Amino acid sequence: MDTVLMATTPPIRCLHASIPTVFRSPAIYQVSCRSSQLFSYRSTTMMSMCFLRRSDLRSRFLSTPKTTSPMRRPRFSVGASTEESSIPSNRNLIVANSVVIVALAVANRVLYKLALVPMKQYPFFMAQLTTFGYVLIYFTILYTRRRLGIVTNEMMDVPKWRFAIIGFLEALGVATGMAAAAMLPGPVIPILNQTYLVWQLLFALLILGRRFLLNQIAGCLLVAVGVVVAVSSGSGADTTLSGIGFLWPAVLVASAAFQAGASIIKEFVFNDAAKRLEGKSLDIFVVNSFGSGFQALFVFLLLPFLSNLKGIPFASLPSYLKDGAGCFFNTGAKISGCDGAPILPLLYISTNLAFNISLLHLVKISSAIVSSLTMMLSVPLAVYIMSKPLPYLPGGSSLSSNFTMGCIVLVLGLLLYNIPTTPTKQHTKTS
């Protein structure tokens, strides 16, 4: 749920979600199977015994009653294999969704760049339009699906305070990210943003109780390194953090942590709802609607701070938004330089909506980490496309050899993450 900050990576959605070749089918089968089994009552309670006994983070989200069956203390190891699931694999669906998401993510980044051609003076207006406009769209869809019986009363009864946490973390991530991006040189921002995947691994361990193989951890790190090398291949790639200090890089890393935490909590909501709904899956528009609604609420409370970060005095914000609306609809004789509106902005918004819905669906059927890896594949593809002459962007640019090297490292990381493994006898017994 996130698209306000386009300083480093194009918007995933305005403030909603700010993230990831298609995965090989054996790998996807492995990921999808593990996520379903890991959320059983037994695995959740077992992991809670061996990790963070004093302040169990997962117990703050779990509200289902504990089982009374005897519990065994598991042996925790980062290199241990996750339990295999007996649920049939939906890897074909994950592959199809991954392909769609890569295509939509590339289109999303390119169209955002094109949308800023007429809206180059009003990027903050675009951010607020998507933030608050998406709330109206999502709740309209949710209301329609509720009337059609697709969304049930049980789905609407899921705890709403979890969505409040999601919205708060995403809004806080946007605010801190904007503050840090204003103080940091451009080339270092995508590098620091790759800590997002590292935070996801950590929060999946703490909140979901998930265990990762060493090849999965190494694969995620390789993907992050590949993105850094590919994105930082431009003329300003030699810019370093020297002379910047520790504060603002730390703030940007914290911003990635907030958004990564929100993505993992979304995954937790889907898995916990499957137990509450007796095997039925939670409709994604319940999560999108309430998550976006709470995010918009917190963004509204932070508007004075956010507008000042963009150099817009809060007292001048109404007139700025009015001029932005005029440029968006390309009306008014006083507004110039808005050629391409409203077609280009509307193309971006419609693509961004489809992208956000598809991305959340991938989180639902696989995991937040799989969605992030899919997203990261789109980064070099989008950079390559935007280096070519485009309508309204005829210039184009050349890419260095580092770009190719970064893409190779990224693909190797994806392959390493998805290496199929054979469960040992011990792991089979614990399933």
From Swiss-Prot:
A Pfam short name: CRT-like
Location within or outside the cell: Plastid, Chloroplast membrane
Domain of life: Eukaryota
Name listed for the protein in its UniProt record: Protein CLT2, chloroplastic
Family under the similarity heading: Belongs to the CRT-like transporter family.
Assigned keywords, A-Z: Chloroplast, Membrane, Plastid, Transit peptide, Transmembrane, Transmembrane helix, Transport
Inactivation phenotype: No visible phenotype. Clt1, clt3 and clt3 triple mutants are more sensitive to Cd(2+), have a decreased level of cytosolic GSH, an altered systemic acquired resistance response and are more sensitive to Phytophthora infection. Clt1, clt3 and clt3 triple mutants have decreased lateral root densities.
Residue intervals passing through the bilayer: 99-119, 122-142, 163-183, 188-208, 212-232, 244-264, 284-304, 343-363, 365-385, 403-423
Annotated organelle transit peptide span: 1-79
Higher taxonomy: Eukaryota, Viridiplantae, Streptophyta, Embryophyta, Tracheophyta
